[in-house]
């Protein structure tokens, strides 16, 4: 089944390009470690999900590009065409000459209604090209104006017009030190609106990806392109084909539906994270070998201790003994030592994958008490390697991973709101103080729900 990607704003369009580039590069990789027949099935499954095809055989991304300034979209169109491997559709873009100035209200209340019909028409045409449509993958930031404000508006429209189709938003969490002075306002407005209209929020923290680039990839001068390539690698390792549960020879048809079914059992809990292992530079890779036991041991401890990468894992954190209250029931003011999960999905790719033992992820102590481990954990596999790694593992988790960052953003936004700082920039475009209060209430409930797991 096909997925239509909606790229919103500078951030969404730059990441979207890297995702499509990573997907196609991987599907054409010769390091697959599997037979030609399997490789062809893998390529066909990838193309069905993310690409249509021109008469001349060039893959065209199933994507809609939206921005209020033309510069970034033009760059991405050009880069895709120059790759010679794939390109964007000729009529798949919508851009204007005026940005949103990092103002969420302007993106949501001005650009959204003004351009709603044009944007939704382009999306409709892209959906109509799909023989079998699964849903939308929406890539956006949450701190700026276009990606976040217009992104929330477009997602709401998709929910209204495609209520039976799945919607997953991939959201970039801003740097803690701040790129935009009103980023906390923009963030709470984005998250609270998406919580009402999206089926799942796949969140990536800029700070965590930056550390992966610096410490694991050994990149000295880290650019946004470096960060976006790590993000694209993580997303590709989630969405590339894996075998279905019924067969080791057929790839699953509906990755979005399967992800939602396994990871979002309750609408109160929609926040998903991705952890990927290994991450390393080409130079280090040549001298490193991996075992499934080693990779999965690291990945499990990353989950338990809420580590974003394999370096610097706290190995002193353990699940609570049965019968004892979990440490995570402590108040937010104390450290959340143990990361309780609602649901986890492990995706394994590479050599000898059938021998990998995932029993450690079935431990009932890892999960909330209201879901049985048999329902809370799932594993997907394929012996086809991903990217440059002979063996790789991905953990997609619905857990308490973002409780502290979310609580901090809500707290910072509340402090600004209490002093009425910058509120006039929002009210003049129709976002009233009541809208802020609704957002605070909504997200405080999300924090409380995750804390009480």
From Swiss-Prot:
GO MF, one example: structural constituent of cytoskeleton
Keyword Nucleus listed: yes
Compartments where located: Nucleus; Cytoplasm; Cytoplasm, Cytoskeleton, Microtubule organizing center, Centrosome, Centriole; Cell projection, Cilium
Top-rank lineage group of the source organism: Eukaryota
UniProt keyword annotations, A-Z: Cell projection, Cilium biogenesis/degradation, Cytoplasm, Cytoskeleton, Developmental protein, GTP-binding, Microtubule, Nucleotide-binding, Nucleus
GO biological process, one term: positive regulation of smoothened signaling pathway
Residues reported to bind GTP: 143-149
Database matches in InterPro entries: Delta_tubulin (IPR002967), Tub_FtsZ_C (IPR008280), Tubulin (IPR000217), Tubulin/FtsZ_GTPase_sf (IPR036525), Tubulin_C (IPR023123), Tubulin_CS (IPR017975), Tubulin_FtsZ_GTPase (IPR003008)
Keyword Cell inner membrane recorded: no
One Pfam family matching this protein: Tubulin
A GO cellular component annotation in the UniProt record: nucleoplasm
Signal peptide location: none
Function: Acts as a positive regulator of hedgehog signaling and regulates ciliary function.
Subunit structure: Found in a complex with TEDC1, TEDC2, TUBE1 and TUBD1.
Record family assignment: Belongs to the tubulin family.
Protein name according to UniProt: Tubulin delta chain
Organism of provenance: Homo sapiens
């Amino acid at each position: 089944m096909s997925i239509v990607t909606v790229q919103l704003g500078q951030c969404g369009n730059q990441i979207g390009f890297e995702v499509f580039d990573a997907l196609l590069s991987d599907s054409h990789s010769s390091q697959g470690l599997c037979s030609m027949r399997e490789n062809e099935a893998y390529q066909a499954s990838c193309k069905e999900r993310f690409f249509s095809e021109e008469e001349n055989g060039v893959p065209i991304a199933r994507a809609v590009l939206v921005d209020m300034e033309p510069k970034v979209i033009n760059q991405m169109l050009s880069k895709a065409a120059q790759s010679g491997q794939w390109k964007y559709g000729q009529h798949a873009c919508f851009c204007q000459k005026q940005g949103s100035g990092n103002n969420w209200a302007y993106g949501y209340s001005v650009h959204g209604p003004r351009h709603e019909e044009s944007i939704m028409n382009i999306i409709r045409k892209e959906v109509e090209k799909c023989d079998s449509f699964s849903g939308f993958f929406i890539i956006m930031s949450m701190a700026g104006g276009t990606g976040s404000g217009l992104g929330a508006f477009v997602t709401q429209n998709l929910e209204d017009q495609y209520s039976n189709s799945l919607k997953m938003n991939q959201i970039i969490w801003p740097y803690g030190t701040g790129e935009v002075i009103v980023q906390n306002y923009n963030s709470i407005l984005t998250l609270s609106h998406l919580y009402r209209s999206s089926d799942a929020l796949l969140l990536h923290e800029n700070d965590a990806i930056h550390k992966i680039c610096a410490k694991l990839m050994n990149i000295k001068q880290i650019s946004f392109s470096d960060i976006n390539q790590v993000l694209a690698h993580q997303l590709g390792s989630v969405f590339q084909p894996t075998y279905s549960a019924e067969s080791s020879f057929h790839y699953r048809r509906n990755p979005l539906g399967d992800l939602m079914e396994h990871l979002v059992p309750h609408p109160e809990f929609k926040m998903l994270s991705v952890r990927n292992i290994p991450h390393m530079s080409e130079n280090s890779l040549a001298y490193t070998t991996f075992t499934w036991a080693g990779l999965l041991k690291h990945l499990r401890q990353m989950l338990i201790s809420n580590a974003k990468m394999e370096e610097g894992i706290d190995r002193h954190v353990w699940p609570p003994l049965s019968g004892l209250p979990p440490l995570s029931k402590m108040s937010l003011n104390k450290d959340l030592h143990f990361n309780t999960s609602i649901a986890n999905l492990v995706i394994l790719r590479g050599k000898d994958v059938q021998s990998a033992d995932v029993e450690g992820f079935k431990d009932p102590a890892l999960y909330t008490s209201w879901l049985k481990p048999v329902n809370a954990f799932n594993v997907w596999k394929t012996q086809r390697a991903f990217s440059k790694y002979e063996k790789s593992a991905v953990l997609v988790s619905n857990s308490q991973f973002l409780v502290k960052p979310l609580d901090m953003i809500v707290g910072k936004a509340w402090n600004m709101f209490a002093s009425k700082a910058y509120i006039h920039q929002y009210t003049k475009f129709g976002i009233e103080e009541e809208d802020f209060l609704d957002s605070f209430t909504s997200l405080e409930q999300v924090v409380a729900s995750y804390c009480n797991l």
